[in-house]
Amino acid sequence: LDLDVHQGDGTAAILQEHSDIFTCSIHAESNFPFRKQQSDLDVHLADETKDADYLACLDRTLEKIQPHHYDCVLFQAGVDPLEEDALGRLALTRTGLCQRNERVFQLHRQYDLPVVIFMGGGYAKPIERTVDAFEDLFTQAAHYTV
């Protein structure tokens, strides 16, 4: 589950031939890479997408992918959807990102699925916004350890 602001093009390309692995990327449509790879499910978001629309899209996507069919979730947890991010094009607040994280971590609780976190992009100015968002991510994750 790639929630970095940029499409998970490398993951999509590498895993294209692996039918036992489902790839899903929710990303800014007009952002890099400009030539997108084909994930199993790509969700393109408009520039300046805010918390409410992003979270509604994430909820619909999680419903679609039916997580209970999988052994684990690999969570590409970029914080570059932040509104302060210099390379993103979305407009999530720090609270919105925390709500995003919470929805992913709920998969662990709801379906007893391990969630593996991968740090993704984060290019906010000032950089402290990125650091704070990653701190939030791992602090939230600590509440879901088994």
Where are the predicted features?
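A general "terminal functional-core" signal
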Residues: 1-146
